[in-house]
Amino acid sequence: MVNKMSREIILHAGLHKTGTTSIQQTLYDDFNNRILEKLDILYPKNWPANHSYPVYSAFCDKPEEYRGNILFSSGLSKEKIDEMNKTNLKNLEEEVQRRRCSKIVISGEDISFLKKKNLNIKLPQQILHIRTFV
């Protein structure tokens, strides 16, 4: 069953060396994350605190050339990386459905390297609106 609830994504494409890691760790912290959820804000917990890896890998033009995949998934074929990306997005979609917050915060430094065209595709159906803050 697809939830038709409209959700807003707040995309924090923090640049490298600007304190983004501190923001991510604060939002990811269990205590703070529960407070955010009570405020109807989801900071996904099924991904690492820094969302760079799952987001950039899923949305870039050539995930097999992404440094994160080269460092952390060395030896995986393009097909396996694509499968991993689909799993990461499915896990996000399931968490969004389960936690039912109307706002979703995604934060990752590598997101700032994505082209705008890459962010306009592959989004789960129930996510309808994106606001980007840099």
Each predicted region: which residue ranges?
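PAPS-dependent sulfotransferase catalytic core
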Residues: 1-90, 95-104, 108-109
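PAPS-dependent sulfotransferase catalytic domain
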Residues: 32, 36-37, 103, 111-112, ...
